[in-house]
Structures are given as structure tokens and as C-alpha cells.
Amino acid sequence: MSWAAHQFEVYAVEAHLPKKMVGQVSWFAIFFGDFTPDFLAKFWVYGFNFHGKHYGATKPYQWHRGWPGMGISHTLFFGIMCCLGIWAWKHNRAWTIGFLLGFSAHVLTDVNDSIGTMLLFPFSTLNWSLHTWAYAATVKGGKYLDAASYYSSLGFMMDFFWLVVVLGSWRVLTRDFWRTKVVPADPHVWSWLGQWLDERGLLALYRSVFFYGVCRMIAWTTWAHVVARPMINGVRHHGYPWDLSWTGPWWVHHVSLPHVTPLIVLPAALVLLGCVYFVANTIWERMESGSIKAIAWRNVRRNTG
């Protein structure tokens, strides 16, 4: 799984919207789309202890990304179903497309760990994984071993990559970008929040996901390599050892699910990403007429009711 990368993705998607969608796609929808997969599945992955008993998934990796399990929450199919629900409910293209882009970013990023995601569900329940780093969520290790493994492997580089992408598009974090591109795409939500927050507060809220990601990355990396004193193979270490080799780190048990050959995963993920943007770009104009008709129909019903 990825950690701070999912926070940075939100701004990367916002900064690289198709030209016709700039200033018209909801930032909140991108955020909720990227947030949804782990919101639905991750709590039971780590579970919790109560009166000395652990409650959670017996096979966290199976529950999180597999089938049967909540692996469906990390499929493009599920994201599309959510988008259809949003469209049927509100006929709001800013939210429908924003959710689709955020959700897709999460699902496609998660092909990197040794479990991956079921990209072709429901046509196939095989996982698609690049095995870039080891998936490390376990019943005994919990989130601490998971974090230590991630921030000692190429997972750290994944977070760093997305951080660089956002910093390379630094204008997405500026007040001017927020005023001219973010607020106009979702005026009602920002206006509603403005009842309690002034402009500085609203801007801080917009930037908060990015700064949370930065703090999360720094804090967990510091804990894993400065604070922690793990016992590995009977040897006490001052911090978890770094291992930036493929499929690392070496000191974590490498788990996987039935999967396709890793050689086709990256090309397939890039093709699917291209398809998502192509479809979003293609239906964008048509959705506008659908929104206008839906609003007109709601007004008619309201007036006649």
C-alpha cells in the first residue's frame, strides 16, 4: 500500500487536469475519490485490541486487496459504480469526474506493492502487482511494521516521487490558484464552509491534506530509522535497515495473491490511466447538457409541487 503518496496525488491530479476541465472539477471530489478505497477497507486491515483480544482480518492482505474480501474497493469497476451513483444522485459533473480521477489515481498507484489491485475486476479476480516493495500489513506487526517496511523500501521513493510532482506544480498550492481554479469549481461547498472559516482558514483547509502528507512522511520515516529499536533475526537494530532493492525490504515476509505476470502491469496501468482520462475528456461536454436538463427538471418538479 502507499502512504503519503495518496495525499500528494490529490494535488497532482488537480494540477494536471485536462485543459477544458481546469477550474471546473471539484477538489473535494478528487480528495474523496482518492480517500474512499482505504476508508472502506483499511480499518479492519489493522484491526484493534479490546480486553486482550484482537479484532480484525486474519489475512490482512486478502481482506484489503483480494477476493473474497474488500479488494473490490480497490478496483476501477467499483470506482465507476460510485461515479454512476454520484451522477444519478446529483447530475454534477464536477463531482462525478473529480471522484473518478481521484479514485483511479489511488487504485493505479497501489499496483506497486507485492499485493497490487484487481484491475480487471469483475472480469478477473487476479491481482496486478509490480512487486516494487513488500506489502507488510500483518496481524502481529500492525501499522507500525507496515510503516517501517514502507519507509525503508522503495515505498519511500514512491512518496518522494509524488511529493516532487506536487512541488514541481507548486502553483497548485498558492492562494491565487485556490481562488481562481479550486473555489469556482465548487462554490457552494466553499461558501458553506465560509460560514465558519475566513479566507485564511479555507486556504489552510485546502492545503491541509498536502501538509498532512508531508508530516506523515517525515514522522514515520523518523520513527522507523531514528526512534525504533527493532529485533530482526535475533539482532537488535538502531532503526529499521534501509533496503531500496526491488521487492524489499529483505526483513519482511513477502506476501502475494494470485496475480498476472508483473511484466504487463506497468503498460496495462498506463493504458488504463489513459483510458480514464480519455473517457472523462470525451463525456465532459455531454455531461454538461445532462446537468442542465436535470436541473431544469428539478426546478419544474419543485414549482409544480
Put a short name on every predicted segment.
Residues 1-305:
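N-terminal membrane-targeting hydrophobic helices
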